[in-house]
Amino acid sequence: VGSKDEPKGQTGFAHLFEHLMFNGSENAPEDYFQYLAEMGATDYNGTTWFDRTNYFQTVPKPALERALWLESDRMGYLLGAVTQGKLDNQRGVVQNEKRQGDNQPGGLVY
């Protein structure tokens, strides 16, 4: 799912959801970046584009099973961990990122 799947006039949901995916799940309630750092992961992030949302990380081989478990957990058990506070916080972050992009040369073209 990407931004092309959003109704006209109601954009930003895919990007907001991408951000929420890093805020913990029902079984792993801490910030997802914390778990990745503890595993020795590098190059971790998420991106949202017109036709997709990506999540990626590079983990040491001994941490692969744990990383795959965390991925499956956040894909299946995110909803119960989303609080109004997390939603409000990430909404502000995404709005800020959009403003920064709009202020770049060509930012409003996309």
Predicted regions and their residues:
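Active-site-adjacent, His/Asp/Glu-enriched structural segments that form or flank metal-binding
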Residues: S3-G107
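Short, surface-exposed glycine/acidic/tryptophan-bearing loops
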Residues: Y110
